[in-house]
């Protein structure tokens, strides 16, 4: 149960999985994020986490994908907190708290990501335009319209849609490649 301001909320289990090195490599190819902390055991051993960690945006997109597969289509504003790193081959669970409109990724002891949903979907493939920009933005200040102007969006936008569909099938069916591309460029 999620404890929120003196209330306990009922959880609805959605899915579980283990992120593998192959998952990381596929996401890196799609997003352009080849940071070795996500791909190399040798490199990761020399970092504070000490082992390879899952791309945070990959875990976010997975949570959105499994949520989308439930049929609840509430995506307008996303408030995301990455609380702890997820390590490769660690079993994690995606849980949904419908009363609070919260999705969490956790294991039995630790919450790794908390996602607050609100609103109705309003992003359509035909309404989004992409352009290059050198404007620097803090991730905390971004909304979907800001993301369109980030430089890496052109790289991600060029991804084969069938490739994106394989990575996040329910999210792709519900929103298409543009939303997934916009979120991926934050990685």
Specify the residue positions occupied by each region the protein language model found.
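Short, Lys/Arg-enriched N-terminal segments with co-localized hydrophobic residues
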Residues: 1-10
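HotDog/MaoC-like acyl-thioester-processing domains
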Residues: 9-19, 72-147
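Catalytic strand-loop segment that frames the active site of acyl-thioester-processing enzymes
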Residues: 9-52, 123-186
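Hydrophobic beta-strand-centered segment that forms part of the acyl-chain substrate-binding groove
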Residues: 45-100, 114, 174-187
